[in-house]
Curated annotation (Swiss-Prot):
Similarity comment: family membership: Belongs to the bacterial ribosomal protein bL17 family.
Protein name: Large ribosomal subunit protein bL17
One function term, GO molecular function aspect: structural constituent of ribosome
InterPro entries reported in the protein's UniProt record: Ribosomal_bL17, Ribosomal_bL17_CS, Ribosomal_bL17_sf
Organism: Aliivibrio salmonicida (strain LFI1238) (Vibrio salmonicida (strain LFI1238))
Gene3D superfamilies membership: Ribosomal protein L17 (3.90.1030.10)
Keywords noted in UniProt: Ribonucleoprotein, Ribosomal protein
Cellular component, GO, one term: cytosolic large ribosomal subunit
Any Pfam family hit: Ribosomal_L17
Record GO biological process: translation
Length: 126
């Protein structure tokens, strides 16, 4: 029975899940928008939102905690210099999930997960 067991298994063992969500969190922080399946996006929220909350108060201890969870100095620097100050006035809800159809190979439901208040990129086609 799976009573009171939170989180999705996603047909992976625990170390694979941990590595996958660490990599996805780094990609989301670096690019501010990524495309993935809907269940992975919903689980990724549970990893990224605490990281951004941690980055709102800049301290050595918080930077070490963020590095322990991401293992990437570039991502930690962006978290504490850009994202922490950007979301300083927002109490949670830093990500948005936008459904975008189905994958061609297996019809898996796909979604974009992005950081809210993301700076808009000017279209080069104009």
């Amino acid at each position: 029975m799976r009573h009171r067991k939170s989180g999705r298994q996603l047909n992976r063992n625990s170390s694979h899940r941990k590595a996958m969500f660490s990599n996805m969190a780094c990609s989301l922080v670096r690019h501010e928008i990524i495309k993935t399946t809907v269940p992975k996006a919903k689980e990724l929220r549970r990893v990224v939102e605490p990281l951004i909350t941690l980055a709102k108060t800049d301290s050595v201890a918080n930077r070490r905690l963020a590095f322990a969870r991401t293992r990437d100095n570039e991502v930690v620097a962006k978290l504490f210099t850009e994202l922490g100050p950007r979301f300083a006035q927002r109490a949670g809800g830093y990500t948005r999930i936008l459904k975008c159809g189905f994958r061609t190979g297996d019809k898996a439901p796909m979604a974009y997960i992005e950081l809210v208040d993301r700076p808009e990129v000017e279209a080069a086609a104009e």
